[in-house]
Regions:
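Sec-dependent signal peptide recognition
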Residues: 2-10
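C-terminal motif of bacterial Sec signal peptides marking the signal peptidase cleavage site
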Residues: 13-16
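Bacterial signal peptide processing site
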Residues: 18-20
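Short, glycine-/small- and polar/acidic-enriched structural segments
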Residues: 27-159, 164-167, 178, 182-186, ...
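Extracytoplasmic/secreted envelope proteins and their assembly/folding machinery
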Residues: 44-47, 74, 78, 89-92, ...
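Secondary-structure end/capping motifs
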Residues: 229-308
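Conserved C-terminal helix/tail region of periplasmic/extracytoplasmic solute-binding proteins
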Residues: 298-328
Length: 328
């Protein structure tokens, strides 16, 4: 699924948006707006389950789910155009590595481990990162992305200079792999499953197998800092309901898939069913509960970015996330 580029101008956009959490919705429920990162998909299923099963209603929350602007959810949430949003630990890093960091905080991990990796057709023979040289790779042209690929290729004995980089924001993985693109960075739970559903034979290399630092959090639920400061009770209520939704989706993948399809009937049923079967096992995985962020893993990735000069300023230890709003 598509990821947006970092929000480079977000700090200059902090005008003109009211805080919707200050308004009571119909029936005296508290209105909260959540900005997605992309069109609805199985990363979001727990949110739709929380709505459909009444968990949000029980918490007194009227949740409005919004599509993101072209720049992604981060800037809109920082501006006060949404109380919550979906982002990624890697792409938001540059916005936090500033004198005035983007005023948002990660309050939950939607998927417990990084499920991204390199995907290619099996007949290309790219069954390890060291075999990527001599092939084409679709790049977002993001420094962090390219540095990670370079590190993994070279650590596996490959010559990164021989990787043919093709700037491309792939939106159709099947079409891309059937064109002049040999390898793509994907999230297996959607694009990897899509190639499986389409009957393609592929090689998939999970990035977390290469470096423990690459087991960062992706995607994450972020919240506006003023919202957290001024209305922590509402933040905790909505997080409790969403957590309940993801726990239910983890335990009932087939029903969860039907709920997502009901909310977004334009989605391909077979893809959603297969993707949900995979991701339902990833929402919580080996964590003690849904959403919890391990500080060591969080800090390890940002430490790697700073060590490799991929951010302008060091991100302080334990900065940018909080587990305090999750159910205790």
């Amino acid at each position: 699924m598509k990821r947006f580029l970092p929000v480079l101008l977000a700090l200059f956009m902090l005008v003109g948006c009211s805080n919707g959490a200050d308004k009571k919705a119909e029936g005296d429920k508290q209105k909260v707006r959540l900005v997605l990162d992309w069109t609805p998909n199985t990363n979001h299923t727990g949110i739709y389950v929380a709505k459909e099963k009444g968990f949000l209603d029980e918490a007194g929350i009227d949740l409005e789910i919004l599509q993101p602007p072209e720049g992604g959810a981060e800037g809109l949430v920082a501006n006060g155009g949404g109380e919550l949003g979906i982002s990624f630990q890697d792409t938001i890093a540059a916005s936090w590595a500033k004198e005035n960091p983007l005023p948002v905080t990660a309050v939950a991990a939607l998927v417990q481990h990084n499920t991204s990796g390199l995907l290619s057709l099996k007949d290309k023979g790219i069954d390890s990162m060291g075999k990527l040289p001599g092939h084409t790779y679709a790049t977002w042209n993001m420094p962090i992305e390219q540095a990670m690929i370079k590190t993994m290729v070279e650590d596996d004995g490959g010559d990164y200079s021989k990787v043919n980089l093709i700037p491309s924001n792939v939106t159709d993985i099947v079409a891309a792999l059937k064109s002049n693109v040999d390898a793509v960075w994907v999230y297996y739970g959607w694009d990897g499953i899509k190639t499986k559903v389409e009957g393609l034979e592929t090689n998939y290399i999970p990035f977390i197998d290469s470096h423990p630092e690459f087991d960062y959090y992706s995607p994450i639920l972020i919240a506006n800092n003023d919202f957290l400061k001024n209305d922590p009770d509402t933040a905790k209520k909505v997080l409790a309901a969403i957590s309940k939704g993801y726990k239910y989706a983890a335990e009932h993948p087939e029903e969860a898939a039907e709920i997502l399809l009901k909310a977004s009937p334009e989605l391909d049923k077979k893809l959603v069913d297969e993707s949900q079967a995979y991701l339902s096992k990833q929402y919580i995985a080996d964590a003690k509960q849904f959403g919890v962020i391990d500080k060591d893993r969080w800090n390890a990735f940002y430490g790697w970015l700073w060590k490799n000069k991929l951010i302008d300023r060091e991100i302080p230890t334990d900065f940018g996330f909080s587990n305090d709003y999750l159910p205790q």
